């Protein structure tokens, strides 16, 4: 028998989340963001459940090629663009849309021999200071690209660092409007948070990511609790051992937890080598036999320990939900000082994955 841990991907939830994102986007077209192997869910496993989208946005050429080979004919956007001039031959062959964020990429496009023009997303730095042209550089970069025979449809693209708040989009929007003055151009600005909460950012294309997988862009599940969004990934395991502690007994590496009285604890077949956060402290929520309880002691490579006080009937073989419909991944992440995005992406290869 295999170790009892398994991740389950709910394709119906994925389809529902896409429909909710579509409704939130109004009349805007929708890029479904499937970077990082579809946020750890497996791009080859989930893309068909997102087939009603208008396009896929990702990073890796390998994933773009996979989608084309699987029969996807609608647009694919490379969010970080191409990394070497030689990549343009691949973009041409597979008809990929690319972001452009640096002058060297404009030069490469000017010099490339392509069979047909490529659609381009000109990336503006709206204040996040990662990729993109500064606002005062946008017009010049736009005009250069517009003059190239290798450039087809040209779209202005930007990203919000703080779209969870109204203030977080107001100032970047001002910069974008100033930079785009006089340019007749489609725009793609909205990430998940902006798609849900800031319709003034929607424009021509929105780019939802984390909400497709049923977690909150703010990191707070309560912010999307009434939206209809559903967790797509559920991570479950079983109790594989039980210990009866006396008062003063310690648990796990570093003896970080000490029982204040007589207490039963369960040992769960899941650890940080499976992608569970190593820094999850005592008190992190977990569900055993349908009852909410908590992690106690340090997370080990292959095991965690949980308090069985709320579920005295639990024993060997009892079902454990680490995150999913009942234990929100955002709550586990928040307790552990991280975000749901990271936990999804950190799911280890050794964890079996099934779909339903």
From Swiss-Prot:
The modification N6-(pyridoxal phosphate)lysine is found at residue 35. GO terms for biological process: D-alanine biosynthetic process. One of its GO terms (molecular function) is pyridoxal phosphate binding. Coiled coil: none annotated. Belongs to the alanine racemase family. Catalyzes the interconversion of L-alanine and D-alanine. May also act on other amino acids. This is Alanine racemase. The gene is alr.
